[in-house]
From Swiss-Prot:
Catalytic activity annotation: XMP + L-glutamine + ATP + H2O = GMP + L-glutamate + AMP + diphosphate + 2 H(+)
UniProt EC number: 6.3.5.2
Organism classification: Bacteria, Pseudomonadati, Pseudomonadota, Alphaproteobacteria, Rickettsiales
Domain GMPS ATP-PPase: 201-386
Keywords carried by this UniProt record: ATP-binding, Glutamine amidotransferase, GMP biosynthesis, Ligase, Nucleotide-binding, Purine biosynthesis
Protein name: GMP synthase [glutamine-hydrolyzing]
Top-level taxonomic group: Bacteria
Residues bound to ATP: 228-234
Length: 520
């Protein structure tokens, strides 16, 4: 299978490079800049990402692997693409002067294509002016020996693309992986062609390869899984079940903090052991208001209950988790060709004393790929396209102390909010929507009487990966705006007229950053 190694020097856009390449049916992995070259020497090509560093900072550890890749290119002619800081590293290595700017350039700007190159073939014509996104503090003043300037900035004549066709080394000062760059994905596609990558990274191939890996490692032994009903958990369970069948034992723990009437809707043939521990969780949360303390109590209690249920199954050697690639990258564990199955090391908070090996069938898939895989397996759209739900459940959406009554109120609000949203055909246009119950009461009037009830906040955001988010529908000046305002008026009326104890509804307009998506 063809594969590209992406060396991450800290760019906020690195995952976008990987997503674009994956969408072109080519496998790629992201590695930290301190990775040993031996780990990545078998890849078909290398991309050096952008980053906040400067070649003048003397970051020997960061530049070390880049230098080894360039030396490897000299011996093998393996293709290299340097983006932003990656360009500066490459050009600096070959002796070009890299100028340290006093002011960072972060904007959409125009470049002019000056010469033909295989990296811009059928993407941009010579003499054409192209919109690109620049995000850099340093710039390359002169092309290194053996390199040709392919494009430069229209306004400031910054070297935008350089290429050494003989060595198959290409560099861009701009970011081809982001949307402001016109046809940037086609430039990346050209690089894949230069690297002779086969377009064979498909959902069918992923399923078959992962099934084979799981079978080979698990053998005839038992696997246990704590299932939540979320997208990642459900897809991981379905894929693992297809590999080992009834060797997989699924446990669903009702914490009392789930959505109203929440159940696990997996493939019909997958058995699930339901355990109701709602009274235990709620009793341990009594009097607790700090969100971190709530999370800790829920996590520890969950581990305790899961251990008890695992002992009932007995003789399990493997624990399955729905870890996905963004979890791995963001936690700093994207290093080396880690196997899909590895020794348990307290991922997810489960204690080492359980002595289980970890099965992570989705470890190298992004969220959008997980959804596609779930569809290929046969899971329903209701499972695949559901909104994210926090691990601690409604405990972090009931602000302040959590008790059975407040959870009940929030469950009622949540059900009305989500169902009404679906009736307005808005649910699939929103990345995440939920309600929050606030620990304050306000005065209201219903009929001829005074009320003193809770305030609930509604939140709906659009996002690509949850790293940033905008309040719906303000990032999208479309017909959805008018529909959404009508929806908000209607759903707030339904809530206050049907949920006892609530007399006021507010809407959260804050983007991320500065706020987080969840309130706690």
């Amino acid at each position: 299978m063809s594969a590209i190694a992406i060396i991450d020097f800290g760019s906020q856009f690195t995952q976008l490079i990987a997503r674009q390449i994956r969408e072109m049916d080519v496998y790629c992995e992201i590695f930290p800049s301190n990775i040993s070259f031996e780990t990545i020497s078998k890849f078909n090509g290398f991309i050096l990402s952008g980053g906040p560093q400067s070649v003048h900072d003397g970051c020997s550890e960061a530049s070390g692997v880049a230098h080894e890749i360039i030396k490897f290119n000299e011996a093998t002619n393996v293709p290299i693409l340097g983006i932003c800081y990656g360009q500066q590293l490459i050009c600096h290595y070959f002796g070009a002067k890299v100028k340290k700017e006093f002011k960072q350039e972060f904007c959409k700007t125009k470049i002019k294509i000056l010469k033909e190159s295989s990296i811009v073939k059928d993407v941009w014509n010579v003499n054409s002016e192209v919109d690109v996104l620049m995000n850099h503090a340093d710039s390359v003043e002169t092309a290194p020996q053996g390199f040709t300037v392919i494009a430069s900035g229209v306004i400031n004549q910054t070297i935008a693309i350089v290429a050494n066709e003989q060595r198959r080394i290409y560099c861009t000062q701009f970011h081809p992986e982001v949307k402001p760059t016109a046809n940037g994905s086609k430039l990346l596609s050209n690089f894949l062609d230069i690297a002779n990558c086969k377009r064979d990274w498909t959902m069918k191939s992923i399923i078959e390869k992962q099934k084979e890996k799981i079978k080979n490692v698990v053998g005839e032994k038992k696997v246990i899984a704590a299932v939540s009903g979320g997208v990642d958990s459900s897809v991981a369970v379905a894929l693992t079940y297809k590999a080992v069948g009834k060797q997989l034992n699924c446990i669903f723990i009702d914490t009392g903090l789930l959505r109203k009437n929440q159940t696990i809707a997996l493939l019909e043939e997958i058995p699930v052991n339901y355990v109701d521990k709602s009274n235990l969780f709620l009793s341990r949360l009594k009097g607790i208001t700090d969100p971190e303390e709530k999370r800790k109590i829920i996590g520890n209690t969950f581990i305790e209950v899961f251990e008890e249920e695992a002992k009932k199954i007995g003789n399990a050697d493997f624990l399955m988790q729905g870890t996905i690639y963004s979890d791995v990258v963001e936690s700093g564990h994207a290093s080396g060709n880690a196997s899909t199955i590895k020794s348990h090391h307290n991922v997810g908070g489960l204690p080492e004393k359980m002595n289980l090996k970890l099965v992570e069938p989705l470890r190298y898939l992004f969220k959008d790929e997980v959804r596609l895989l779930g569809k290929e397996i046969g899971l329903s759209n209701e499972i695949i396209f559901q909104h994210p739900f926090p691990g601690p459940g409604l405990a972090v959406r009931v602000i302040g102390e959590v008790d059975e009554e407040r959870v009940r109120i929030l469950q009622e609000i949540d059900e009305i909010y989500i169902n009404t949203m679906k009736n307005y055909d808005l649910y699939d246009k929103i990345w995440q929507a939920f309600a929050v119950l606030l620990p304050i009461r306000t005065v209201g009037v219903m009929g001829d009487g005074r009320t003193y009830g809770y305030v609930c906040a509604l939140r709906a955001v659009t996002s690509f990966d949850g790293m940033t988010a905008d309040a719906f529908p303000f990032e999208n000046k479309s017909q959805h705006s008018l529909i959404f305002w009508d929806f908000l008026q209607n759903v707030s009326s339904i809530i206050v007229n049907n949920v006892s104890g609530v007399n006021r509804v507010v809407y959260d307009l804050t983007s991320k950053p500065p706020a987080t998506i969840e309130w706690e």
